[in-house]
Amino acid sequence: MNENIAEKFRADGVARPNWSAVFAVAFCVACLITVEFLPVSLLTPMAQDLGISEGVAGQSVTVTAFVAMFSSLFITQIIQATDRRYIVILFAVLLTASCLMVSFANSFTLLLLGRACLGLALGGFWAMSASLTMRLVPARTVPKALSVIFGAVSIALVIAAPLGSFLGGIIGWRNVFNAAAVMGVLCVIWVVKSLPSLPGEPSHQKQNMFSLLQRPGVMAGMIAIFMSFAGQFAFFTYIRPVYMNLAGFDVDGLTLVLLSFGIASFVGTSFSSYVLKRSVKLALAGAPLLLALSALTLIVWGSDKTVAAVIAIIWGLAFALVPVGWSTWITRSLADQAEKAGSIQVAVIQLANTCGAAVGGYALDNFGLLSPLALSGGLMLLTALVVAAKVRITPMS
């Protein structure tokens, strides 16, 4: 609670909004998210070039999420009073270094090391992005500034997979990461030029954030968050081999499918507020239920290209409700400890991404093409049941 008050005090103390810094933060977030998901659309050529299976190559997503999980939990304890401006610059440098390491990787180990650097930057930056934004604009402008940040995330999610697939077919997967490194350099330059000094707190009163899990319905909510994101990554990480081998899409066709998925996600995010105004619980239970049915449809009729393409669109629309819905749940049910709850949420999501991609890859290599879909669908169904039975939503006052 003390940290929330402190953040509000800082926001109130800003005389004018620093929009250049806000957009610099948004650009960094967009680049981090884009690079995080690039392997999804480049999995097959990466695996072939490095002489590994697609399931093993998918662990490049796993290690990023795993490192990001720990980074989001412990970054504030590690950096303590360090000026946040220097920390953000460091994260932008790590983004650039990660892309270059992946681009020049001649072994699976170096690939994982590069992706681990990305995870460090991703988790730390994502955990700090909201508080950074609140210190760059007056209190009355904070919602608008935050919308810029989350808008950048939506755009990154739209373009990452299809752009990677398209460029990978033209210039090769290594040059795609070289291009991403250039974007990282732009992040460094923009942050250096626009971000003001943002001193850290000289001291903190230590509180156990995990005590929040003892509140009624909170543990169930975190379990549901874990299962929904694990289910998403169990399937989405391996969408390329599934769609190319099950439905017979070529690279161009897959690019269109991924683009459709991204656009659907953007549309779903844009209209999510209308659904959430009606019922947060219905959205949090209904979206994973629809995803479970979509996974079942792909298992049964996924060899039909039209069906597979339509399911990709439905999947994008439905899953868009999930992250927005759970953020809304935190602001409703954990409003007094929203910052700490958000830190736990980021860690849970990254752990879920790690486990989902890891188990999905193992299933793909050992149990066949449909196994990631079955795993994803099962987790989504369990999510819907947990939300319906155990998760509590505080009504909007």
UniProtKB/Swiss-Prot annotation:
Domain of life: Bacteria
Record-linked CDD domains: MFS_NepI_like
Bilayer disposition of the protein: Multi-pass membrane protein
Catalyzed chemical reaction(s): inosine(in) + H(+)(out) = inosine(out) + H(+)(in); guanosine(in) + H(+)(out) = guanosine(out) + H(+)(in)
Gene Ontology molecular functions: antiporter activity; purine nucleoside transmembrane transporter activity
Record keyword Thylakoid present: no
SUPFAM superfamilies according to UniProt: MFS general substrate transporter
The entry's keywords: Antiport, Cell inner membrane, Cell membrane, Membrane, Transmembrane, Transmembrane helix, Transport
Residue intervals passing through the bilayer: 22-42, 55-75, 86-106, 108-128, 148-168, 176-196, 216-236, 256-276, 282-302, 306-326, 344-364, 367-387
Entry-linked Pfam families: MFS_1 (PF07690)
Subcellular location: Cell inner membrane
Periplasmic compartment residues: 43-54, 107, 169-175, 237-255, 303-305, 365-366
Keyword Cell inner membrane listed: yes
GO CC, one annotated term: plasma membrane
UniProt topological domain (Cytoplasmic) ranges: 1-21, 76-85, 129-147, 197-215, 277-281, 327-343, 388-397
Predominant location category: membrane
Family: Belongs to the major facilitator superfamily. DHA1 family. NepI (TC 2.A.1.2.26) subfamily.
Function: Involved in the efflux of purine ribonucleosides, such as inosine and guanosine.
Name assigned to this protein: Purine ribonucleoside efflux pump NepI
Organism this protein belongs to: Salmonella paratyphi B (strain ATCC BAA-1250 / SPB7)
Classification of source organism: Bacteria, Pseudomonadati, Pseudomonadota, Gammaproteobacteria, Enterobacterales
GN (gene name): nepI
